[in-house]
């Protein structure tokens, strides 16, 4: 996540950036497959001694697909050709170990849970261009557990390990989004994908990344 903080005395804009994903949070993540600290936005406040009233905006960063490092439940995990393609094109390997990251389609249920526990005001979607390479794209919009539909994220790893994702499928787009710097330049199918995520998460997607360079960034709305 990223916390945007405006200093009231000197009017200096500062930002705080978390190092780990929300679902690794020791209290609100998929325990015991978590880290040893609070990785949600609130952890930044206690860690740095900042009052909640000083925070101007909380932004959450999501990839256009889902990844996980190490063990733990992963409802939308995929294998085979599609997983390998995403991993290779997106460079999804551990920064220090080089270990391949686990790959899955976008899990909107988990993402919506993350928006709640972090109190997100705004969302950044990265690596949209990676999805240029697929004829079909899936988004998990709910789960099925023991014949029942779940529209919430259960943090119990026993339940998570036995649920099935319910997908909404999108046609892939045959136009490249790589390095685009304007939302108007994105094709209509990719826009539909972004709009769907925005509607499900009920948080505005203000920034979209379409490549590794700084210039490959689309800013849709004023951030601060």
What function would you assign to each model-found segment?
Residues 1-7, 11-12:
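Single conserved hydrophobic/aromatic residue that forms the stacking wall/gate
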Residues 14-17, 24-25, 60, 125, ...:
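General beta-strand structural signal in soluble alpha/beta enzymes
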Residues 21-22, 28-29, 44-47:
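Active-site loop-to-helix "anion-binding N-cap" substructures in soluble metabolic enzymes
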Residues 25-29, 34-36, 69-74, 135-139, ...:
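Short acidic, glycine/serine/threonine-rich loops at helix termini
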Residues 30-34, 48, 99-104, 183-187:
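Hydrophobic alpha-helical scaffolding
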Residues 34, 38, 42, 48-52:
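Conserved catalytic-core segment of NTP-binding enzymes
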Residues 138, 148-224:
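Internal helix-turn-beta structural module
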């Amino acid at each position: 996540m990223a916390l945007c903080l405006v200093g009231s005395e000197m009017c200096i804009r500062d930002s705080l950036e978390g190092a780990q994903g929300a679902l690794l949070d020791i209290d609100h993540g998929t325990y015991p497959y978590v880290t040893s600290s609070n990785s949600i936005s609130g952890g930044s406040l206690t860690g740095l001694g900042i009052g909640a009233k000083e925070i101007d905006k909380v932004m959450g960063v999501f990839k256009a697909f889902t990844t996980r490092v190490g063990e733990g439940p992963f409802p939308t995990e995929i294998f085979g050709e599609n997983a390998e393609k995403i991993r290779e094109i997106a460079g999804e390997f551990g920064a220090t170990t080089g270990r391949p990251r686990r790959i899955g389609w976008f899990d909107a249920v988990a993402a919506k849970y993350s928006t709640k526990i972090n109190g997100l005001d705004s969302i950044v979607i990265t690596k949209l261009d990676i999805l240029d390479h697929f004829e079909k794209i899936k988004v998990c919009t709910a789960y099925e557990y023991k014949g029942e539909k779940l529209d919430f994220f259960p943090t119990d790893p026993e339940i998570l390990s036995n649920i099935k994702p319910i997908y909404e499928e999108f046609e892939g787009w045959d136009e490249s989004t790589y390095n685009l710097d304007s939302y108007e330049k994105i094709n209509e199918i990719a826009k539909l994908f972004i709009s769907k995520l925005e509607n499900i998460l009920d948080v505005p997607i203000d920034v979209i990344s379409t490549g590794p360079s700084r210039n490959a960034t689309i800013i849709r709305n004023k951030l601060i």
